[in-house]
Structure formats: C-alpha cells, structure tokens
Amino acid sequence: MNAQYILEQYKSAIHERDVERFVSIYDPNVHIYDCWGHWESKGLAAWQENVTEWFIGLKADGEILKVDFQDVVIEETADLAFAHCAVTFAAHKESDGEKLRQITNRFTFCMKKVRDTWLIVHEHSSLPISMEDGKGMFGLR
C-alpha cells in the first residue's frame, strides 16, 4: 500500500457515504483545518462527528458526491508522506445522477505509516479569498 491508496479510499468512502471507512484512513490524533463550517477538528472523535453530520445531510438530501483529484503531487518516504492537490466535489442526485453543483478546494494531506498502514495525521483544505469582498473564490477551477 502506498500513499496514493489513501486518496483512493478517501474518494470512494465519500462517494459511498461510509463514515467508518472514511475515518479509518485517519490517525486517532488527526488535526484538520477545514474550510467548511468548523475552523478545525482535533482528534478522530471530533472529525468523525463532523463527517457523520456531513454524510447524514447528503443522504437526507438524496445526494452523492463524486470526488476528483487534480494536479496530485505526492512525496513519500518509508514512514512519512505528503500530498497536495486540487479536489473537486461534485454533488449529484442519487435518483438520476443529475449534477447539481460542484466546488474545488485546495488540499494538503500529511500521512505517517503506522504498522504498515498509511494514516492521515494532518489535513488542510482552503480556497483563495477575493481581495474585493473577502469571500471564498469557488469558481477558479
């Protein structure tokens, strides 16, 4: 297993709205800076709470997310890795697949190997901010 595998697990667990599988790729002491709703999440329990709320909302709205990674750069050593990329989240109606909306965020994932398994120990998502109005710029990609 390499660090790329973690990104594929991230992508498929979101699409399947599988909370347990999604949080299984994170270290118990993960520290996340998220650009949605919460400034940060410290520890797996806090992150799992946020993810559960997110996936429940998707299910209630009858939506699935398709995740796509662009411009992925991964640096990997024997026990540490980092990846940075653009991540597009496209919401689709579960019933007929109609695309509803999409956004692209910038992401950095920092991983460490624990007992031959890569785990995300730090994640940072961001958007550029408009200098004119101070709002996140969603449509640049």
PLM feature spans:
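Extended, polar beta-sheet/loop recognition surfaces of beta-rich domains
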Residues: 139-141
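A solvent-exposed, acidic/Ser-Thr-rich amphipathic alpha-helical stretch
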Residues: 6, 19-79, 86
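Short, surface-exposed coil-to-beta transition loops
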Residues: 67-69, 84, 102-107
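Outer-membrane beta-barrel domain signature
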Residues: 97-98
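Generic short beta-strand segments
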Residues: 85-92
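Generic hydrophobic alpha-helical segments
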Residues: 9-10
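Short beta-strand edge/turn micro-motifs at domain boundaries
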Residues: 102-135
